[in-house]
Amino acid sequence: MVRSDIIRGHLDSIILRLILEKDRYGYEISQEISNRTNNSFQIKEATLYAVFQRLEKKEVIEAYYGDVSDGGKRKYYRITSLGKAYLSELVKEWAEVKEIIDLFMEGLE
């Protein structure tokens, strides 16, 4: 398992990326994270909903209730245009961080 404190600072990026692909509800996002990481990282429900609240407050995502015919009245999240710009900034920031870390970690495998 990956230490959650390493990933924690990048949860906004991960969640925004998943919502960029398509509108999603909370459980779907947590399952997608687990699946894509082969269960090496699992997000706790409380953490996930805290991120949703923070992102909604920043107006980078918005919530709406899905149609009952889609399997119940689930709360879905979609990315806003502000969210797309924010995600773009986060991607650039990650590239810079990765470059710095790589400078110190190269050749240590």
UniProtKB/Swiss-Prot annotation:
<dbReference type="InterPro" id="IPR005149">
    <property type="entry name" value="Tscrpt_reg_PadR_N"/>
</dbReference>
<dbReference type="InterPro" id="IPR036390">
    <property type="entry name" value="WH_DNA-bd_sf"/>
</dbReference>
<protein>
    <recommendedName>
        <fullName>Uncharacterized protein X</fullName>
    </recommendedName>
</protein>
<dbReference type="InterPro" id="IPR036388">
    <property type="entry name" value="WH-like_DNA-bd_sf"/>
</dbReference>
<dbReference type="Pfam" id="PF03551">
    <property type="entry name" value="PadR"/>
</dbReference>
<dbReference type="InterPro" id="IPR052509">
    <property type="entry name" value="Metal_resp_DNA-bind_regulator"/>
</dbReference>
